[in-house]
Amino acid sequence: MHELLLFASVPSHQHHELLQQLTGLTAMQPRHCLERRLIFKATRKPDLANMRSGTGQGPDIVRLNKMLNGQMFYTQVVGPLSEADFDGKPSSSDSQDVSMSGTHEAAGSSYDYDSQPWRLEFRDTPEAGFRSTITARLAASAALPKGDVVPSMNAWGYSFVTEYVVEGDMFIYNDIVIFLHRVLQYPATGQEPHEPRRQLPSFRDLAPLEKTGSYILQAAITVQDGSNQELMRTASQHLFGLREQLKSAVRLEHADRLSLDTRAR
């Protein structure tokens, strides 16, 4: 499938006003989203056909494996979170007994790493020359087993690189998914952990990646058959229509292609 996108940077002071505007435009209340995003890098040509038990060989896996076609990319493994997963205050002994985990654990948190659901998301490098005013790229996703995904990812030819948290609000407007979000980083430690954290810090310990506190507005449409030019043209027109409706608030535009390059070198 193909994903068509437009993006805008939203200053922190404009965040609340834009939320209200999107609520009115879409006639829905925002759906708050929290996600863990684990980044993996291909260290050899992957073969997702050799998946371990628990994933199955469903159509999503078959399609994803065909799309990767033995090429090497960065991919992300995404897991939904709730605010309760971050509840609790760091204990006084955190600095001593959790230094190996790369972060302070949240005492009293309900988070259970072994029950964490995951999905593997692949996003290709945006197509060159599709349209100078829109971002288009191949996309695919597949469900993964709950819990520790590292052994499976390693077996498929991927190694863990880093992780972060995404916080935002989602709206649906006709066939457009609108996501107003920001990237949050874990507390700085002496060194980066070599595997995903099994416990999460207190939410207040997370820091925005963008120091100014700005947000990203992403508008996306998924087209199942990217070879159908009429569908692609219609989807593009819908995004341009949204851009026109929001032009007094934000400037939706395509992203720099190389800034979204997912190829592993």
UniProtKB/Swiss-Prot annotation:
GO BP annotation list: positive regulation of transcription initiation by RNA polymerase II
Gene symbol of the encoding locus: srb5
Mitochondrion is among the record's keywords: no
Residue segments, region Disordered: 85-112
Family of this protein: Belongs to the Mediator complex subunit 18 family.
Its biological purpose: Component of the Mediator complex, a coactivator involved in the regulated transcription of nearly all RNA polymerase II-dependent genes. Mediator functions as a bridge to convey information from gene-specific regulatory proteins to the basal RNA polymerase II transcription machinery. Mediator is recruited to promoters by direct interactions with regulatory proteins and serves as a scaffold for the assembly of a functional preinitiation complex with RNA polymerase II and the general transcription factors.
Record's GO cellular component terms: core mediator complex; mediator complex
Organism whose genome encodes this protein: Emericella nidulans (strain FGSC A4 / ATCC 38163 / CBS 112.46 / NRRL 194 / M139) (Aspergillus nidulans)
Matches recorded under InterPro entries: Mediator_Med18
Ranges of biased composition (kind: Low complexity): 91-101
Pfam families per the UniProt record, alphabetical: Med18
Subunit structure: Component of the Mediator complex.
Protein name, as recorded: Mediator of RNA polymerase II transcription subunit 18
Assigned keywords, A-Z: Activator, Nucleus, Transcription, Transcription regulation
Annotated Gene3D superfamilies: Hypothetical Protein Pfu-838710-001
Chief place of localization: nucleus
Subcellular location: Nucleus
GO MF term (any one): transcription coregulator activity
